[in-house]
């Protein structure tokens, strides 16, 4: 949860969530589809549960 948001180099447009440690909230972003880190969740609920 402390890793930065990582969009990745691919060009897909997948809606995902990450934990923003600055705001202390799970926030949405558009994921490119490859080269993710561990701060990448399919739903806001999954993000909140993990972080």
From Swiss-Prot:
A GO CC term assigned to this protein in UniProt: extracellular space
Protein name: Kunitz-like toxin PcKuz1
Family annotation (PROSITE patterns): BPTI_KUNITZ_1 (PS00280), BPTI_KUNITZ_2 (PS50279)
Domain of life: Eukaryota
Family the UniProt entry places it in: Belongs to the venom Kunitz-type family. Sea anemone type 2 potassium channel toxin subfamily.
Subcellular location: Secreted; Nematocyst
Keywords, comma-separated and alphabetical: Disulfide bond, Nematocyst, Neurotoxin, Protease inhibitor, Secreted, Serine protease inhibitor, Toxin
Role this protein plays: Weak serine protease inhibitor that has been tested on both trypsin and elastase. May also act as a neurotoxin by inhibiting voltage-gated potassium channels (Kv). In vivo, is lethal to zebrafish larvae.
Pfam family, one: Kunitz_BPTI
């Amino acid at each position: 949860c402390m890793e930065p948001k990582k969009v990745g180099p691919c060009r897909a447009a997948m809606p995902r969530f990450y934990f923003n440690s600055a705001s202390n909230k799970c926030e949405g972003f558009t994921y490119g589809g490859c080269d993710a880190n561990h701060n990448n969740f399919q739903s806001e609920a999954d993000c909140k549960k993990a972080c």
